């Protein structure tokens, strides 16, 4: 998993272009595409695109470990699988900057502590709101939960449609890509993987 996890440095505010520079870049792209950025329908587009991208790629400003920092120890002895499935997300392919639309299924085996359920969805959101590959995102989510919560094991499955395949190139609409990552007991004990997969199928 470590070979897949990519920890790219994030530019601080001193290294980032300004809002004005981002808007000018959009104008350049519009001209390159053959459009006139000054026409009525496009006058506000550079500003809108820059603001939208600030939200879409807001994951660069967040740290997953901070979100996962608060855990609960009062679990009444519960130590079996915790599964949160069908977590919807939108991301963007780092190769073509077009959308990836999918859902994540995440499980872990508690080791005396559990997460608030919203924290798992927030971690998915943090990594989805960056330029991504599905393989890297799968591994990043598992690593963040594994290292922060230190459970007995983590299982992550992501299924998604990549619009870089649907809109361009091979143009295969509806194709779904599945990726999985397992740590701890989910990796070393095949029976735990089977239980994870069975629970996913059982809730379909």
Swiss-Prot record:
<keyword id="KW-0342">GTP-binding</keyword>
<keyword id="KW-0862">Zinc</keyword>
<keyword id="KW-0554">One-carbon metabolism</keyword>
<comment type="subunit">
    <text>Toroid-shaped homodecamer, composed of two pentamers of five dimers.</text>
</comment>
<keyword id="KW-0378">Hydrolase</keyword>
<dbReference type="InterPro" id="IPR043134">
    <property type="entry name" value="GTP-CH-I_N"/>
</dbReference>
<dbReference type="GO" id="GO:0006730">
    <property type="term" value="P:one-carbon metabolic process"/>
</dbReference>
<comment type="pathway">
    <text>Cofactor biosynthesis; 7,8-dihydroneopterin triphosphate biosynthesis; 7,8-dihydroneopterin triphosphate from GTP: step 1/1.</text>
</comment>
<dbReference type="GO" id="GO:0006729">
    <property type="term" value="P:tetrahydrobiopterin biosynthetic process"/>
</dbReference>
<comment type="similarity">
    <text>Belongs to the GTP cyclohydrolase I family.</text>
</comment>
<dbReference type="GO" id="GO:0008270">
    <property type="term" value="F:zinc ion binding"/>
</dbReference>
<dbReference type="InterPro" id="IPR020602">
    <property type="entry name" value="GTP_CycHdrlase_I_dom"/>
</dbReference>
<dbReference type="GO" id="GO:0003934">
    <property type="term" value="F:GTP cyclohydrolase I activity"/>
</dbReference>
<dbReference type="InterPro" id="IPR001474">
    <property type="entry name" value="GTP_CycHdrlase_I"/>
</dbReference>
<dbReference type="GO" id="GO:0005737">
    <property type="term" value="C:cytoplasm"/>
</dbReference>
<feature type="binding site">
    <location>
        <position position="164"/>
    </location>
    <ligand>
        <name>Zn(2+)</name>
    </ligand>
</feature>
<feature type="binding site">
    <location>
        <position position="93"/>
    </location>
    <ligand>
        <name>Zn(2+)</name>
    </ligand>
</feature>
<dbReference type="GO" id="GO:0005525">
    <property type="term" value="F:GTP binding"/>
</dbReference>
<dbReference type="InterPro" id="IPR018234">
    <property type="entry name" value="GTP_CycHdrlase_I_CS"/>
</dbReference>
<protein>
    <recommendedName>
        <fullName>GTP cyclohydrolase 1</fullName>
        <ecNumber>3.5.4.16</ecNumber>
    </recommendedName>
</protein>
<keyword id="KW-0479">Metal-binding</keyword>
<dbReference type="GO" id="GO:0046654">
    <property type="term" value="P:tetrahydrofolate biosynthetic process"/>
</dbReference>
<dbReference type="InterPro" id="IPR043133">
    <property type="entry name" value="GTP-CH-I_C/QueF"/>
</dbReference>
<keyword id="KW-0547">Nucleotide-binding</keyword>
<dbReference type="Pfam" id="PF01227">
    <property type="entry name" value="GTP_cyclohydroI"/>
</dbReference>
<feature type="binding site">
    <location>
        <position position="96"/>
    </location>
    <ligand>
        <name>Zn(2+)</name>
    </ligand>
</feature>
